[in-house]
Design a protein with these regions (language model features):
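Pocket-edge structural micro-motifs
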Residues: 13-14, 30-31, 164
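Extracytoplasmic "Venus flytrap"/periplasmic binding protein-like
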Residues: 1-13, 19-21, 126-135, 155, ...
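Extracellular/periplasmic periplasmic-binding protein-like sensory domains
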Residues: 126-197
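Periplasmic-binding protein-like
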Residues: 1, 12-14, 51-56, 106-116, ...
């Protein structure tokens, strides 16, 4: 941020962000927590349970979003029973899986702000450990769309939830037009997602 302001250059920032800064040199088009995380937590509280485990990649967005969600949960009768972070790209998820099992032995809500390859290992190992919707776990992810589903494998995500501002499978005229134009330009096998929208 200081570099763009000092040089008076412009940055387009298309992914979700913390929402706690503003600059005339940055155009944020991604969701802030009040547009993604907070509505998802409201829905989870009303429909899925009160005991939450927060897991995320270890950088500013997951930590800030989780701080906001903890306050929201506290104010609305929810409870954080655990919280843990992985360095970006880390696939050593077994310790986190063990913590989830210990904190939520009979099921509960898991909010996932992991990114990248961490999600592949996370969902595969969660299924192997029996942490699935069929066993009473509601899992909400904030950085998973069609491309990530293909990388992880849909069989590992069945019954889980994702909250993002755009999915190419969204059944609206605008989504269909955008996705068709995107595929015409970049190829039919390419997948668009929230940041690309």
């Amino acid at each position: 941020l200081p570099v763009f302001e000092a040089k008076d250059h412009f940055l387009f920032y298309p992914i979700q962000y913390e929402g706690q800064e503003c600059s005339k040199n940055i155009f944020y088009s991604g969701a802030a927590p009040n547009q993604q995380a907070e509505p998802a937590v409201d829905w989870l509280l009303k429909n899925k349970g009160k005991d939450f485990f927060l897991v995320g990649s270890d950088y500013v967005y997951p930590r800030t979003a989780n701080t906001i969600m903890k306050e929201q949960l506290k104010a609305n009768g929810g409870k954080v029973v655990g919280e843990d972070y992985l360095p970006l790209g880390n696939t050593e998820v077994a310790p986190i899986i063990a913590k989830i099992k210990q904190a939520l032995p009979k099921g509960g809500v898991i909010v996932n702000t992991l990114n990248g390859d961490s999600n592949v290992a996370f969902f595969k190992q969660m299924k192997a450990a029996g942490i699935t919707p069929a066993n009473g776990y509601s899992i909400m992810s904030f950085s998973i769309a069609e491309e990530e589903i293909a990388a992880i494998g849909p069989e590992y995500l069945e019954g889980t939830y994702a909250a993002w501002n755009f999915f190419q499978s969204l059944d609206t005229p605008a989504s269909k037009t955008f996705t068709k134009a995107f595929k015409a330009k970049y190829g039919d096998k390419r997948v668009t997602n929230d940041p690309a929208e």
